[in-house]
């Protein structure tokens, strides 16, 4: 868990998936973490590398895997906050609510990511008092979620969404965050939400960790 949360974002999704069965594990749930450990051992020289002189600008990637949990059909949120060319904060977590569409799942993931980015911005302004309030770009590959976040009006398609997720609309209106569309192939938070083929996994891992 420490590796997944502190130094190896490339293991976060696998550790999250296995951790769900920690209470009543079976043989399969034992073999899987062994595979994760073998991967970590074989890539023990990998680590997060920051670029000197690249500034303190924060950018974020938000993604969701809709209804991926078979038992209760809950989706998975994934988010990564980048600074100085590499990931400084990331998460892979099962959403606490059951969402009714891919757009809604992505919207909830956006809210989770923006909360993490807000905290990091508070830390930055505490360490660097003259830093000021920056506008943080959040990259999202779902146009529906992007439009929903930028629309201050609740419609029949969004009025059921829990109000705690709508705070991001005010932040976008104030100009504190901007949601930018990114192609799915370049959605680097994908590695935090779902299993990927080897090529895609390495591409996103190398980007987040600046390998």
Question: Where are the regions a protein language model picked out?
Answer:
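Conserved helix-loop functional segments at active or binding sites
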Residues: 42-46, 67, 87-89, 119, ...
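C-terminal reverse transcriptase regions that engage the nucleic-acid substrate
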Residues: 1-46, 183, 192-193
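RNase H-like nuclease module associated with reverse transcription
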Residues: 21, 57, 75, 93-211
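Conserved catalytic core of Hanks-type protein kinase domains
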Residues: 6, 39, 82-84, 112, ...
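Acidic, metal-ion-coordinating active-site neighborhood of RNase H-like domains
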Residues: 35, 61-70, 189, 193-194
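RNase H-like nuclease fold core
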Residues: 60-103
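Structured nucleic-acid-interacting core domains from mobile-element enzymes and related host factors
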Residues: 38-64, 129-132
């Amino acid at each position: 868990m420490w590796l997944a949360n502190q130094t190896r974002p490339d293991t976060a999704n696998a550790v999250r998936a296995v951790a769900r069965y920690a209470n009543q594990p079976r043989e399969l749930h034992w073999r899987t973490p062994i595979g994760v450990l073998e991967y970590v051992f074989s890539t023990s020289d990998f680590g997060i590398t920051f670029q000197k002189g690249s500034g303190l600008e924060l950018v974020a990637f938000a993604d969701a895997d809709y209804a991926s949990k078979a038992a209760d059909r809950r989706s998975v949120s994934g988010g990564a906050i980048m600074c100085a060319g590499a990931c400084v904060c990331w998460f892979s977590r099962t959403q606490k609510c059951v969402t009714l569409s891919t757009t809604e799942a992505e919207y909830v993931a956006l809210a989770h990511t923006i909360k993490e980015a807000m905290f990091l911005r508070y830390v930055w302004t505490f360490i660097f008092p003259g830093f000021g309030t920056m506008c943080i770009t959040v990259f999202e590959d779902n146009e529906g979620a992007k439009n929903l976040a930028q629309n201050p009006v609740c419609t029949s398609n969004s009025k059921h969404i829990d109000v705690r997720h709508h705070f991001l609309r005010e932040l976008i209106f104030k100009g504190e965050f901007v949601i930018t569309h990114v192609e799915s192939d370049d959605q680097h938070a994908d590695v935090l939400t779902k299993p990927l083929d080897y090529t895609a996994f390495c591409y996103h891992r190398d980007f987040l960790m600046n390998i």
